[in-house]
Amino acid sequence: MDDLMDFFDSSKNFKRGTLPRGCISGDPNAYTSESSDSKPIKREIIGTKDVNEIVQKEQQLMNQLVGGPSNTKRTKTLDELESDDDDKMELNEAPTVRSDEAFYEKYHFDLNRNRSLPIYAQREQIMKAIKENPVVILKGETGCGKTTQVPQYILDEAFKKREFCNIVVTQPRRIAAISIANRVCQERRWQPGTVCSYQVGLHKQSNSADTRLLYCTTGVLLNNLIRLKTLTHYTHIVLDEVHDRDQDMDFLLIVVRRLLALNSRHVKVILMSATIDTREFCKYFASCKSMPPVVAASHGRKYPLVKYYRDQLKNINWKTEPQQREPGITHEGYRDAVKILLVIDNMERKAEGQSEQSYEEAKRTGSVLIFLPGVNEIDTMAEHIEHVMNESPNIKITIVRCHSLMSSDSQEDVFQPPLSGHRKVILTTNIAESSITVTDVSYVIDFCLAKVMHIDTASNFSCLCLEWASKVNCRQRAGRVGRTRSGRVYRMVTKAFYMEEMQEFGIPEMLRSPLQSSVLKAKELDMGGPSEILALAMSPPNLTDIHNTVLLLKEVGALYTTVDGVYEQLDGDLTYWGTIMSRFPLDVRLSRLIILGYIFNCLDEAIIIAAGMSVRSLYLSGQRQRTSDAFWMHYIFADGSGSDLVGFWRVYKIYVNMCQNLPMKDSEVQWARRYNVSLRSLKEMYLLVQELQKRCAALNLVSLPVGASHMWHDREKSIILKVIIAGAFYPNYFTRNNKTIPDYDRDVYHSICGNDPCRTVYFTQFVPRYMGELYTRRVKELFLEARIPPEKIDVTFQQGSEKIFVTFKGDDDDYMNSTDVVQVPGRVTTEVYKAIRMRMNNPNRSLRVMDQNSALKYVQQRNIGVVQDSKWVPPSKQWNVELLTLPSVFDKKITGLITYIVNCGKFYFQPRSLAERIASMTEIFNAPEQLSYHVRNASAITKGLQLLARRGSKFQRAVVLKVEPQSNAIPQFLVRFIDYGDWALLAMDQLRLMRHELRRDLEELPPRMFECRLALVQPSSVTSYSNRWPQKANEMLSKLASCGPLELEVYSLVNNVAAVLIHMRDGVLNDKLVEHQLARRADEDYMSRKDHDFRIRKQKMKRYVPAAEQQQVNEEYLRFNQLPQDADLEPPPLDKCHTSIRLKGPYSPLENSMNSMLRIGMYKSVAIEKESVNAVLLDADPQDRHDQMIVAASVTESDGNDKLVARGTTLMPNIHGFGALMAMLFCPTMQIKCNPERTKYVCLLAGLGFNPDTLEPYFQEHDMVINLDVGILKDDIRIINQMRYNIDSMFFNFDANELPAVGVEGRLVIFNQLRNLLTRLLGKDRSFIERHVWNSKYVWEDMSDLEPPSEPYGKRAIFPMHGSYDLESEDMGNLLALQENCSELYDWQNFDGVMQPRNCRLCNETLESVTQLRLHLLTQLHRDREKQVGWKQQ
């Protein structure tokens, strides 16, 4: 018994790993700084009870279990017993089982069992063991019949005695429970759902009272036993596949063992598995008087199986190296596996004459299964095999990949025969250990590796770690061969390493996976605290992991921070949120998403998203998806939201609608293939959605009845979904890390030579001497891979630079208000995203060019450009800038007409000064001689042709955009009016061809209008979707334009687009849009501010500059504003291009990386999973210097613990302060800190809180600091507190044992209050504030001098009220000093020399030069600060 007690001694070191903080992953050396915030976090753990005492008490209960014949007599009906102790009977006295004669008369019982199954030989021994022992262990190889036959043996025995029995058999997988139950019914000729039935989740085959044999998933039985708290509902409990050791199974073993000893001593427990560790299970269920018997059933092996180890293969020519200790595959390892393939091929070739089987037949039936740890290793192995095939054409191999991310179609390839004359080699992960059986496999090459998911319980970051596989795994892999013919297994480790170093069994899930589910089940079991219950596990987790899990459950609202009002480290009372979470087969954060969906009345959407996050690989993954446009289907479903989760919701809704409208099965297959969707995963997701909806209904979580007053509009829903995502996945918050870099915006434009960063990418490593303009068309062709047509691309070069600039043109379809099929967030065009995705797939592009001398001869022979001093000057367009209709640099205001409006960000303006010229042109166009050139033949009209087209009652010049498909034989043409900007779809009779003379005169005449956009504003993220201007804003502009001439104030002119302010009688339209919450104030980008600064300085000097000089300066200004033009030359023939250049790119200056906002992730690099819509992470609003938050549904950690990977990401709305507001709304608690003068809130520290006595944080790993960059006011904190109160009210009940009492009417009131409060909170126009830096930002402060806020729900609040200091008025002396500083900065504004660095005290920024100072004074931050300190320019 000493050995047994030593086994149960949880004070011994049950470590998950050797890492600090009691975590399974996380490297203290990963931190890059020695600051106090970056040092490894350590926490002292003190349990509430001695673990030994817990284990000893449990063992005393087990010791009361006595085996022997007396247990077969029972004095009471077991299915009616609450407890064996109910009648205070003697220990050895058992209830008598009632007769079940009526039941046995009702159904046919055939007692002839299948004698050919190996298990049959052990039938008598099995039944004897069950009869005499409370616990029996049955070890039987796969296929021996134990799962189907043993329960029938028990049932047959009861039939013979006419005794009642009720058998439950658990299965780890749903499909197994269903298929086995149906197989038993078929074998016994029972109607399914009668004698034998199944239950998976909430789905029962029937509710028949006649069911005596129930197959169910492990979780079903576990939940039943937790609810009943007794085993006596069953006579026999059969736990199958117990070797799986997942958390449900380990916790079920705790419950069964506890209840068996406590109140269910006469229930029989049978443990079954093919690879069970019998010694461990015997010890676990041993009592002082007996050990559970082990019955073994084996059927032997029909065909021989030979195993080889690396050191036994002396005849293979490879390097003799010592066995590596660190798990991994070296380059030599891959080559050695290829050598084994060659040895197999030679062996079968030589055996052809000595065997009845031909060499070709041996190849066909001699497939090779290579076990590799992951997809990357599969790809590397495939490359090595392909390399050998390329060098040796006689080696013919068909490579088949097999992993969990494959489509179902690809999985079928595993079972297909190879091509004629080929050998099939299957490269697989451990999925083929048990899930897939391939009959033609004769050889296994096993690298003895596996990737196992571990969890760092302190950070909640999971990590897929490469490890040596267990011997059990290796034996299962070896079992894939030798089934239909003899087989060989090659293990790529030495025999000594395999026998002595590798573990017999893998690490149980409870020691490496999240414990949230187990802790919640322990709370529901209510037989002790989580640490006490989990100490009874077969492999108990250490106290640190239990403590971390309890902290995490407190963070998500599943547990209160206290037990009966007193704080407990290792425990907390269960909340109703926790009860809900325990009923869902989901991660607790996904359950939290459903709860918030219920509260904010988007329950269906939340359920769908949660289901989408729970199934694997909704989108297909593979070579095709990396190289084609299939990936962009993710963006189509995300619809510009920047959210993988919203994409899941939309793809599901489209799929369900399609299934309802398309009855043909082939249609859904074609749809799934077209949109790169895994149909299998979608169907699994559909079933999970149905399951979750049933579970919600059982908990009375249903959507509010349909009504206009409480339904979200589409615009609102796009925001509210992101709000509940931010709430559900707090604190997985990330920010982009380049927004605070000084001169960020200047560097962006500098890197692309002043081009528009929202439309431009660039390549590097082009050699300038190769005369790049000759190859512009070749560069454009590189983008055909991304389906970007060459006509939408301009390619330019900068003299002496190694960069090639690629700018994507605006689409003429903009004039129809159409949108791209692929929507992306913000201002950046879709083509830029596609270009960056191209580089992610392949970072190098090859471009064939001529050498310099040949190229010079080539251009001279063809008169392309000019060669001067052995340097080529390419042809370029000469700008007649005096003809451009663009505002002069000296003109601040212009009067004229808005001729056409696309939206507030794009409209066209005709200056009044051109009125006479336009009238004259109209008169010429409409002269009879010009209108006589009718279009006789539609083929004469081509895209790009200039002609005359009817606009209203007059003809105007136009250009053909598109020839529309003919309908009813009447061709129509889409034209754009050159001098007005609008477009029309016209028939042939409304068009006129231009006379040659007229076309010649007007061909070079630029449009008599210019493009404009509203300055200093952008669409409000609250009222618009994906940076689109709201319809109401466009209507306000249209109404103003219809009133006649307008006065524009030109802010800047960049790329021939004027940023303007439109003056009205009662103000400025730009400001009115902000007042109506249709727009928000915004900074202008760097080039716009630079141009504005230049313009205002020129306008100040206007009175001193003569008119002729003004014209000269303006022409120079306009000429400078024109960007280099695409030469678009015919490239030299490829047979003349003998030099190949490897271009790198394309790149964008707007590419971002992320930082974790959690303390534990501060110094780790962050990447986004490659399949995400945010994998290409660009600064979609480069002019906006505010942080835009990204939320991840889950975070994994690299094997080296220095890199985080964010999965299921969502880009939050670009609402200033949104990240801080969401953290305040959904964090457990927070402290909002003031500046030293207490005049403004500047920083918030959010987390689980702190010990009021020591000020030590409870969960410092998850503490989060957010430095505020906008004003947060006391009123905002009041609104947030009201929202937190309403969220708590939805589920609160003063009696913890009852369900929440809020009915439909109460829910409606709460929902409408939440809706109004959220609208107020997000709709505010917040002023910018300067950033503050704190040395002690992670320190919780003693705020005992602050009057605590009233707490309506006391310590039963999941979201307690936030307290905060009242703000003081700004000190007058300080205000005067800031005003003086501001005046000094404006004095330096006109200085033209070299300036020493100066500080802007208003904004806490250092200004290095006069140019930087001038542009800083134009920022929204500085303008807001001027208002805040009361400074006005004289």
Curated annotation (Swiss-Prot):
It is found in: Cytoplasm. The keyword Cytoplasm applies. Disulfide bonds: none annotated. Residues 66-86 are annotated as: Disordered. One of its GO terms (cellular component) is cytoplasm. It comes from the Eukaryota. A motif (DEAH box) lies at residues 240-243. This is Probable ATP-dependent RNA helicase spindle-E. It comes from Drosophila grimshawi (Hawaiian fruit fly).
